[in-house]
């Protein structure tokens, strides 16, 4: 340019130099000849399919992303210079003539018809873009273009599950191709999950050295543990950070399921059949009601594609309610011959349905346990519709909202009393083997707590001769450890002198914590939440607020006693 006197001036410019991720080599653009497809007509049909709700994308926010891509689509470069792929169906004659055909035989026939002589054709060395080939997948794998039985049965399918990062590259291409070549959308729903990142939220790559090998994780912690971690850690369309510590915790969950099941199966083998059938206890009615609620909740969440929440709901039920509470209480009920058969039946029924709930999340351990349960029960305990051949084909458990809300509320109150006493024992370093005395004052739950006194004595480690349950507070001033659960007052006799100052400080801290909760709930219930949230959810929050206020008032009364 200087020699031709075409240079006006020279100036230095700071430029971004693109480099490859792995090797760091400079990437330079180069103009080349490629094959393109005019994709606009196909994009319009694919866009209309989503707008007309023939295809529903979950989460719905990605419909805007989908529309933006298709409304601004450009011609599609479909040729790639790769070693592997579907060859571009184009052949060249020696004179440069181009023949696009279904196969080589057809290309030669067209060449002869046009050129009138036998020639040698050369096929284009390029291959189709991967997304072009994979866009044909929903129907090409079923025998298309032939009208096969598989194509008639499986196309269109119900739902596609994939990552949000290939919504345009793959999902949109499948929709465009499906409509163009079959006249039908390839699927009715698209569920988009997020990406799995490392514990720090970084994308996994060999360069960073943060790639987690799933095979190694499965070898060390189990396939079910990894599967459950991925499912419960995900929400629709959002990335998840994969923590190995979480996988370890879910391995412990698998062990919990195994141990709980081993307990039930062992009791079936150990306890002979007893024809007596007594009325259901409060614990029986509670666990059956909670099972129904859990089945209903899990079903609803799965239908809404909230798979992580569904798995967490099942997790909390089997660990926090079935294993931690009902199994512990069943040990007391199985010691009474009049309640053994009913208790065993409920243990089996709840375990059977819970395994069905968990099967999509932890299929291997649940199938193994269920087969053992089925074999052990034989004809003694048979589900309503019999034992299917395998858990994987067993009917999904149905459930409904509890028709025994009082039983659930009463049992929850009982367990909260036990939990509160256990926490107090821990705070005061009372050995697990040491029995203590307790005075429980309640007017609202007097009958229930009196009936369940044996459970309190056993699970809270209270000495049976030193427990009093009263409806009226007629105590004289004492320095016992004082606790509150809603409107129920609990006073523990630990056979030790209680530090009044320390007890005062503890109660003041509890009152402060309750005040914070009360303030939070008052703000929540005064906000639009109260009008927009479901009525049952709002009612639960109102009930919780009432209980917090009652606990605060009772603790304040106890604080006054200590300060006198």
Residue positions per predicted region:
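N-terminal, positively charged nucleic-acid-binding surface of large information/translation enzymes
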Residues: 1-46, 70, 136, 140-141, ...
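A short glycine/serine-rich beta->alpha loop
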Residues: 127-128, 154-165
